[in-house]
């Protein structure tokens, strides 16, 4: 079978899956309830807020030293900052921070994506929230930590790599800062690692729905040299969701050819 025939076969399977409506819930059958809580880890430090999936640590500094603020070169200077840092995950944390700034009087002042994933193909993350009141900043970090149980729902991995999908009906300031996403419009993030998987996912997404490209990153251009391809899209909510789900199906199919079936550790939310 030629490579073109293989791609066409996979695309046909993806379109068939997306076009098939999900089974209706059986009346009377209890549905699982997803808990969204920070991990139960304790620490006596006042700066400690909590931990979460992805080796994520939430911290807050009530009164940042001015010399550190100068060295950090933040766009805006705030007396109090919140720190959301992780070994694994970039998209889930950016999406969680986006929800945090929607819910609190805080602002994302810095987003960095270190080469990490604990030796895998992707990123870690370092996100700084700023605010004039330490209680607002702490609340922002709490919201972000709790959101991670949801935003990790469409991260699928196996021994060869991972795929990641994110979706929101209304982008806010974290997505704008990270990718230039239009505020108030639906936004989707599509990630594939190895990068070859991500390129195919990106192409599938754009062919499956009428969406706009916001940003594209590849190993030498915008990914901290991780082995990923990343597409960020915007548009009408239904179209963005369609593009993201189409990319998810073809990404899972292709990644499975390199190893076991890709699995997610949290329930899918898209």
Swiss-Prot record:
PROSITE patterns (alphabetical): BMC_CP (PS51931)
Domain annotation BMC circularly permuted: ranges: 47-152, 154-258
Assigned GO CC terms: propanediol degradation polyhedral organelle
Phenotype caused by lack of the gene: Releases increased amounts of acetaldehyde when grown on propanediol. Cells do not make BMCs, diol dehydratase is found in diffuse aggregates near the cell pole; it was later found this a double pduA-pduBB' deletion. A deletion that prevents synthesis of both proteins makes no BMCs, about 20% of cells form amorphous polar bodies. Grows in an interrupted manner on 1,2-PD and vitamin B12; grows for a while then stops, then restarts as if a toxic compound was accumulating and then decreases.
Keyword Zinc: no
GO BP of this protein: propanediol catabolic process
Residue segments, region Probable helix that binds cargo to the BMC shell: 6-18
Stimuli inducing this protein: BMC production is induced by growth on 1,2-PD vitamin B12 medium.
Record keywords, A-Z: Bacterial microcompartment
Pfam families membership: BMC
Posttranslational mods: In purified BMCs seen as a 28.0 kDa and 25.0 kDa form, both of which have been N-terminally sequenced and whose N-fMet is removed; the smaller form is called PduB'.
A single GO molecular function term of this UniProt record: structural molecule activity
Practical uses of the protein: Artificial BMCs can be made in E.coli by expressing pduA-pduB/B'-pduT-pduU-pduN-pduJ-pduK (in this order). Enzymes can be targeted to the BMC, and appear to be encapsulated within it. Upon overexpression of PduB or PduB' and mixing of the resulting purified sheets with 2-ethyl-1-hexanol, will form closed shells. Enzymes (tested with endogenous BMC enzyme DDH and the peroxidase activity of cytC) can be encapsulated in the shells; the enzyme is active in the shells. The shells are permeable to a variety of compounds, showing they could be used to make protein based synthetic bioreactors.
Additional record remark: Bacterial microcompartments (BMC) 100-200 nm in cross section are formed during aerobic growth on minimal 1,2-PD-B12 or anaerobic growth on 1,2-PD-tetrathionate medium, but not during aerobic growth on glucose, anerobic growth on glucose or pyruvate-tetrathionate. BMCs can constitute up to 10% of total cell protein.
Job of this protein: The two proteins produced are among the major shell proteins of the bacterial microcompartment (BMC) dedicated to 1,2-propanediol (1,2-PD) degradation. Required for structural integrity of BMCs and to mitigate propionaldehyde toxicity. The N-terminal 13 residues are important for correct assembly of the BMC shell. The isolated BMC shell component protein ratio for J:A:B':B:K:T:U is approximately 15:10:7:6:1:1:2. The N-terminus of the long form (PduB) is required for correct formation of BMCs, deletions in the first 37 residues have substantially reduced levels of the major lumen enzymes.
UniProt similarity note: Belongs to the EutL/PduB family.
Protein name per Swiss-Prot or TrEMBL: Bacterial microcompartment shell protein PduB
Organism: Salmonella typhimurium (strain LT2 / SGSC1412 / ATCC 700720)
